[in-house]
Amino acid sequence: MKIEKVQIKNFKSLRDIEIVLRGFTLITGVNSSGKSTFIQSLLLLKENRELINQIATNSMMMSSLGEHPEPLKTHIFKLVEDTKKQPISLEGEYIHLGDKKDIFNQEVYEEDISILINTLPLKEINFTINYNNLSLSSTTQIPLSNVINLFSDDFQYLNTDRIQPDRTYELSEKHIRKNLIGTKGEYTAHYLYENRDRPLNIKALKHENTKTDRLLDNVSFWLSEISNGVKVLPKKHLDTHQASLSYQYTYGENTTNEYSPLNVGFGITYVLPIIVSILKSKPDDLLIIENPESHLHPVGQSKIAKLCAIAVANGVQIIVESHSDHFLNAIRVATKEDILKPEDSAIYYFSKIADSMETKVEQLLIDANGKINQNWPKGFFDEYDNQLDKLISW
């Protein structure tokens, strides 16, 4: 199920905020205002999903204690108590949060962290992190892997530090089996090789210029929207247990030799995991992307936003952190062109409360004409106008 709302208390700079998520949710704002902290709150739960599921399993066992013999009851009691004492993990595949002092709000330091998630259809689950021992408690009584898309094996997070052009890349059978490409997209080459003939789950994501719904064909055609005529070629090298990428360009009737990622534009490889993540998605999946605009020309930024819009219109839930006005405007255009409905998207502007380290969050909505009718907060994509005013005044 999709996440409908998240309420967070006492996590880093997030003293008490509420975010209503839509199909597409854009997180933006000034630097160091709490945007990544919001994403980290979700990743913290994802990182500790096994502990959360154990808590749920314990709850189910406790509810049926009367049916078991005494020795088994004693064992269950011990298991439950041991789980209660187990601290959450602050380091792992999804998060690198440091230690206890780094995650609690400094202005109310001795209060527990609370993260409340509402799902669709409406179901409320509260997670509490104890200030004293970092133990986790939860109101869920069932394992969440099949209940909330955040805990699904198909959840994909791409942080801003993605793979760069290189001669070879890692293999990971574990990630490929789980339909994942890594938080940096580091297994993208391996994934593309193994799944090159796999049909798209969402037919609407098929590029208009390709005749097939093969993943690799569509990745190349969407990539060519960013660099005209490019084709990506993944390879797997069993002798070195590595994967590689190369690129070819087609112009007219001609095709170039294969080029290493080191010999084409940096942004081509940097955006590749984003395109793959969107094209491999299916309805109800959750995808979180940080700074998709990095190293892309404005046209490329707009194309990625349009691809996101098509995925959202077909049931994927996407959270994007971005500073790009081109990305925002492309989502507005997608709404005006009826790819997205107004209720499909929400924008949140993060800033800091004056004379405080506390995050302030303001919601903005896009109407059917692509307009943002609320007053734009100071700092919300207004720098173009600020600089233009200075030019005009000369």
Indicate residue ranges for each PLM-predicted region.
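Pre-Walker A-like glycine/lysine-rich segment at the N-terminus of P-loop NTPase domains
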Residues: 1-50, 54-65, 297
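Phosphate-binding P-loop
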Residues: 16-22, 253, 278-283, 310-312
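Walker B catalytic motif
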Residues: 289-292
